[in-house]
């Protein structure tokens, strides 16, 4: 009888694992934001900073991401933007927020003559406010919409 129950439950187990498994290795939007935009320990001061970081953070796999911004502040300062002034996102959604103060950022822009797999970036440092889209519970940044 124990074997019969096991054989009856086996298809159910396979179904549950089939539904759960695809999400196991998936990067959340908040984790992707951190990977693509956070560098709290860095300064972005080297001319090769963007080339190194874009490769290290997997934004040159298969193609060159044209533009990216790294934030050189504690993650808590960036999370704090989600409780600041609400602004409309570039895509028209209403879940964007502007940081209350300027943050140290590095903009990486693909140079005009650069092509995959030799992605070559211009590195520029600024002190600017950032606009982030926030989602979830807890409410955290999931997209860097702009720097102003």
Swiss-Prot record:
Tissue note: Pancreas.
SMART domains: RNAse_Pc
Gene Ontology CC terms: extracellular region
Top enzyme class: lyase
Keyword annotations from UniProtKB, A to Z: Disulfide bond, Endonuclease, Hydrolase, Lyase, Nuclease, Secreted, Signal
GO molecular function: lyase activity; nucleic acid binding; ribonuclease A activity
EC number: 4.6.1.18
Keyword Manganese tagged: no
Signal peptide: 1-25
Gene3D superfamilies xref list: Ribonuclease A-like domain
Pfam families: RnaseA (PF00074)
InterPro entries: RNaseA, RNaseA-like_dom_sf, RNaseA_AS, RNaseA_domain
Taxonomic lineage: Eukaryota, Metazoa, Chordata, Craniata, Vertebrata
Catalyzed reactions per annotation: an [RNA] containing cytidine + H2O = an [RNA]-3'-cytidine-3'-phosphate + a 5'-hydroxy-ribonucleotide-3'-[RNA]; an [RNA] containing uridine + H2O = an [RNA]-3'-uridine-3'-phosphate + a 5'-hydroxy-ribonucleotide-3'-[RNA]
Membership in a protein family: Belongs to the pancreatic ribonuclease family.
Source organism superkingdom: Eukaryota
Binding locations of substrate: 32, 35, 65-69, 90, 109
GO biological process: defense response to Gram-positive bacterium
Active site: 37, 143
Protein name: Ribonuclease pancreatic
Function: Endonuclease that catalyzes the cleavage of RNA on the 3' side of pyrimidine nucleotides. Acts on single-stranded and double-stranded RNA.
Subcellular location: Secreted
